[in-house]
Amino acid sequence: MIKENSKAPIFKLPSSNDQNFEINKNLDQYLAIYFYPRDNTPGCTNEAKDFAKLYEEFKKLNCEIVGISKDSIESHKKFINKFKIPFKLLSDEKMIALKKYGAWGEKSMYGKKFMGIKRTTILINPKGKIIKTWNNVKVKDHSKEVLNFLKEVI
């Protein structure tokens, strides 16, 4: 489990903008990284759309939003185009960042346990420190909660 006030683990993943995203090269700003199970599913679509609606407000606070799932770049591009998502989505097919950030683990649904992506959001400051984690996220109003927290710490 990732801890608040710890150094953000470094990773490099392919991005929907056809470039690699390296966390250590993006620390000139706050980063709101959200891990989600799958493109084009109801909860994940709502979460992406909610962050997209508030994207300009995050940008005004010098915060970039990044979504990460195991989906391919091709899937991410279709998802971005379909729902007009203004931020990058990263493909973590090998579960590099998912595991480093504790977003991969045991889940349960309808009484069955299985391994999967746990909906998680991490807020990182420009010094590379994790300042807040949200685990087992409920989508409704989550993006507003992240934005409000960011406003409090700036």
Q: Which positions does each model-derived feature cover?
A:
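Chalcogenol-based redox active-site neighborhoods
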Residues: 1-154
